Amino acid sequence: MPGLFAAKKLKSKRQKFKWKDTHYKRRSLRLDVKADPLEGAPQARGIVIEKVGIEAKQPNSAIRKCVRVQLIKNGKQITAFAPGDGAIGFIDEHDEVVVEGIGGPSGRSMGDIPGVRWKVTKVNNVSLQEMVKGKIEKPVR
């Protein structure tokens, strides 16, 4: 049993050992936000640099249509998935797109697309989903 007036010592000791816990340390130093290209934001705008096809992981066999995007706010480059049948046709180089998280576990990639954590939601301020459905035409800039 610790002494009657040992609370301060116990508390400071616990505080010191907290830093050995990886989850506490990453949370306290905000390492996930610092490493995130979107800097903790839910969405970000960017300019399309090029279109890329990424092969799906085993056991699936497909080429997932993605785009390389340079973010406007910090200049970092990310790869974003273009969801929808024929969606890549509505995205051209130098278009302005809005990207958001793809919805994988713990902010990671989803399904069989390796290393892709984001998806395109808007192209030139028009919803990509609406363009794929045929409800809206892509505006000419």
Swiss-Prot record:
- Gene Ontology cellular component terms for the protein in this record: small ribosomal subunit
Q: List the keywords (alphabetical).
A: Ribonucleoprotein, Ribosomal protein, RNA-binding, rRNA-binding
Ribonucleoprotein keyword on record: yes
Sequence intervals crossing the membrane: none
The UniProt entry's GO biological process terms, in alphabetical order, are:
translation
| Functional summary from the UniProt entry | With S4 and S5 plays an important role in translational accuracy. Located at the interface of the 30S and 50S subunits.
On assembly, the entry states:
Part of the 30S ribosomal subunit.
Q: Which family does it belong to?
A: Belongs to the universal ribosomal protein uS12 family.
Q: What is this protein called?
A: Small ribosomal subunit protein uS12
